[in-house]
Amino acid sequence: MVVEFTKSEALHKEALEHIVGGVNSPSRSFKAVGGGAPVAMERGKGAYFWDVDGNKYIDYLAAYGPIITGHAHPHITKAITTAAENGVLYGTPTALEVKFAKMLKEAMPALDKVRFVNSGTEAVMTTIRVARAYTGRTKIMKFAGCYHGHSDLVLVAAGSGPSTLGTPDSAGVPQSIAQEVITVPFNNVETLKEALDKWGHEVAAILVEPIVGNFGIVEPKPGFLEKVNELVHEAGALVIYDEVITAFRFMYGGAQDLLGVTPDLTALGKVIGGGLPIGAYGGKKEIMEQVAPLGPAYQAGTMAGNPASMASGIACLEVLQQEGLYEKLDELGAMLEKGILEQAAKHNIDITLNRLKGALTVYFTTNTIENYDAAQDTDGEMFGKFFKLMLQEGVNLAPSKYEAWFLTTEHTKEDIEYTIEAVGRAFAALADNK
């Protein structure tokens, strides 16, 4: 039982004097769970965190997804250390970036060509530019609630970060830019068709999270992604998959490979960096050849393909190639799902739980969650109380009702058993205070 956060509170007070909002990403604040000082972590190992007060946690945040192999995995840390000893940045081509690109192509057959960048935001931003260059069109389509990074064009009806010809979701995004974005509900073919009938001749591409991760884990309805491909291609536009969260999370490869649907372009990030900053994008050869120096679509980056990130990414994928690893994540995910649902029934707490393999989301509602409107119509106040009760139990979750719980390769059955017991105590406390 965690009872002391004195040092975290003091550190946050100091951080507020020097860092905007006291955090370097707004999702790290506790604003969405009732406020207070966010817990500051000092170190991580495997499936566990220790904060600055010395409290230990089972971690299901996994840095919002990238840490699929657990914290400080020895194979990855060794690769990073070796790369750093040889120099962290050259500004030249390296053998590491060629090896890593080949690994990504072998894992994801839709990638004829690849280019490395520094973040998922950059990857998505650049796929949009490439799609516009290839089609000669300007408008972009996306699904409501799906978050594709913080560049201007995609901060429109966004998901877990912020909340129908577009409306900006952030100050500083001009209405003129937002009007280049058409937003439609996820899992709704009819609305997509209507939008394409109206604007399809102006659309360069549609951005798709093939499995949604930013208003919780939401799978596409059977046949939905196939219909997206069909309708968008009929309109002469491209399909871009944002696999920043999903790639290598559910299988060795992308969600596109798991689901058997092929996009024209793909944006990658998170898991492929093994915990270091990274992004990548790729796709069909004829489309990717729009990118400089071969084509007119310019993209560059001083840090892109840096040796440390390349080495970390290679090492991470080498770990993920181990036999039975994804089956273990699915087994533990199923065990956790069953336990949470049993505790909810025992304590008469209304929840809906969405899970795919080693990732899940607990929504405080009885409604089915298959789009952003349904995810919004859940009890955020109840989630905030649950989040803080779990923190007291030594279980670290994301401080948002929209985020997923991520399992890592280092979680054990004992971790899951303890977590289920902690959920039971948290639900009991919530039931007592209804």
From Swiss-Prot:
Source domain of life: Bacteria
EC number(s) per entry: 5.4.3.8
Catalysed transformations (reactions): (S)-4-amino-5-oxopentanoate = 5-aminolevulinate
Key words of the record: Cytoplasm, Isomerase, Porphyrin biosynthesis, Pyridoxal phosphate
Any matching Pfam family: Aminotran_3
GO terms for MF: glutamate-1-semialdehyde 2,1-aminomutase activity; pyridoxal phosphate binding; transaminase activity
Compartment(s) of residence: Cytoplasm
Modified residues annotated as N6-(pyridoxal phosphate)lysine in this record: 270
Gene Ontology biological process terms, A to Z: protoporphyrinogen IX biosynthetic process
Pathway: Porphyrin-containing compound metabolism; protoporphyrin-IX biosynthesis; 5-aminolevulinate from L-glutamyl-tRNA(Glu): step 2/2
Self-association and partners: Homodimer.
Family statement drawn from the similarity comment of this UniProt entry: Belongs to the class-III pyridoxal-phosphate-dependent aminotransferase family. HemL subfamily.
Protein name (Swiss-Prot/TrEMBL): Glutamate-1-semialdehyde 2,1-aminomutase 1
Organism from which the protein derives: Bacillus thuringiensis subsp. konkukian (strain 97-27)
Organism classification: Bacteria, Bacillati, Bacillota, Bacilli, Bacillales
